[in-house]
Amino acid sequence: MNKVFIVGRLAQDPQQFVTQNGITQSRISIASSDNWNKNETYFFPCVAWQSTANFINSYLHKGDLVAIDGKLIRRSYVSKEGKTVYVIEIVIESIKPLSSKNSNNAASSIDKNYNPTNTKNNNYSQQSNMSVSEAMDDFESNFAQKTSSTNITSKNEEKETFKDDPFALNDDEDPDQVVSLDWLDEFKE
């Protein structure tokens, strides 16, 4: 399952684009910190499409606190210098404004105007005065409801599904298989 849930603030105003086919796109960066280490902030690039992008472009601004529900994707493009650039970003499936740094009137305006048509879960699409921990609890309960009805596959079916995935580990064939995470040390301070 590919699912991402992040609570954080917009690091900049949304960047609006329209594709050659006339589809609206919004790009934002979410700044979030760990509960245990408030001194370290992480920035997550995010993209939204169509009605979700229209909502973001119309109502959200730098500094607004939001809860994002989405999925992680990897894409590539060729830079102006001719180099292939690989990007990992979050595709926003739904977004819920939690508070605005700009004004209190923005919240009531968001409530009235945002009615998503392309999101699967409207629970995260409307304004709320929830705290971050309440938003996370709400997400976890909705996530548990969704996954409890999910059909679990057998181990053989799972092997079949991931047989072409070079990153999938199959510990049944090699019980001593170990994945080294030493490369993560270069990102630590």
Swiss-Prot record:
GO annotation, biological process: DNA replication
Gene Ontology MF annotations: single-stranded DNA binding
SSB domain ranges (all copies): 1-99
Gene3D superfamilies, per the entry: Nucleic acid-binding proteins (2.40.50.140)
Compositional bias (Low complexity): 100-124
Pfam family name, one: SSB
Positions of region (Disordered): 100-126, 143-176
Key words, A-Z: DNA-binding
Domain of life: Bacteria
Record InterPro entries: NA-bd_OB-fold, Primosome_PriB/ssb, ssDNA-bd
One GO CC annotation: nucleoid
Residue ranges, compositional bias (Basic and acidic residues): 155-166
Skewed-composition ranges (Polar residues): 143-154
Subunit structure: Homotetramer.
Protein name stated in the entry: Single-stranded DNA-binding protein
Taxonomic source organism: Malacoplasma penetrans (strain HF-2) (Mycoplasma penetrans)
Source organism phylogeny: Bacteria, Bacillati, Mycoplasmatota, Mycoplasmoidales, Mycoplasmoidaceae
